[in-house]
């Protein structure tokens, strides 16, 4: 399939892996921001076929994972009330708060429904005028346009029984918070392709300049990730710090102007608390004053609910790139997708869920480290012998011709 097969091409990926190994001369720490990127890295073993000196750490780009526990408790409180229909995407139903999760509310008789679009919730409100319908509006900038459209449409149609519980968060302030945080080791970022498809990447340019970090916007296929890593390493080795767009087939510098205008019409920027991270200034969206009647926190008076987060789960440190899932003593033991202790194990985009899904809980930390330190037949460290795409191990030396002309031109002859 066009725009898919060539970005999963084994030969192209192998050539990129070898180009990275040839380019790197010193240790570098690169953070992939988005949870979708994390899953690609773990699923295809990309982190295991990189040179030992290139370390990938996982960032806060999982919207379910960073939704504050108190927001889950507010959702729990609203959904437990009689006469309401509480709507959410499915992955939010199992996220634990201090009072339990939304599935427990449903099992106790609450009307909690999974929807596939916020417009489904608007239609429910129109069909049930005698009931309050609430949509749990979480996510990064990617999901803000449809949520804004739902609010705008409900307001236009005069649906006074429709409201949204807003917990939108923004990527650029989180990157700044990571760079300013204690113990930060991140030297470059793989930027979030889906977010940038909506917002563009002008907001990332001041971050690259101020903190002197390369930022490469990437897609989500193996070749996307490896090409993004190669571009990042080239910048690091050359002492360059700029924003590059590897995901040019989907991302423009200016983003999607129509979506941005819709967001700006309905939302305004606010401070936001992130689970495991704390309050990050100007890192969220809230409804503008003219749409206040659709604010579920205001309508149900739950904005005073505050919650202390558990100290057992280390998901906050995972989200900041300070630890990895296998650093947690509970990972794969008392914390599994069936009985998660934290949001990073619940969400399909969470780093802990990715590690578990692709068998990392079956490996010891030493096995994971050793998988990156193998040498080739000539004894050269960093010259990787194989690349794994899916369940297939392909010798790098058999890379052959690249079917993706752009990649071939980028890495040169094998």
List where the protein language model places each region.
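Metallocofactor- and cofactor-centric catalytic cores in central/energy metabolism, strongly enriched
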Residues: 1-130, 144, 148, 154-157, ...
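A conserved active-site cap/scaffold subdomain adjacent to cofactor or substrate pockets
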Residues: 165, 183-252
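Internal helical hairpin/lid segments
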Residues: 226-317
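Hydrophobic alpha-helical scaffolding
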Residues: 6, 65, 136, 140, ...
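Short, basic, low-complexity termini and linkers enriched in Ser/Thr/Gly/Pro
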Residues: 363-393, 404, 409-414
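Phosphate/pyrophosphate-binding betaalpha-module
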Residues: 136, 140-203
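Flexible, glycine/charged-enriched surface loops at secondary-structure junctions
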Residues: 27-30, 161-162, 238-248, 274-275, ...
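Short, surface-exposed amphipathic charged segments that create phosphate/polyanion-binding patches used
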Residues: 71-74, 126-133, 177-182, 204-206, ...
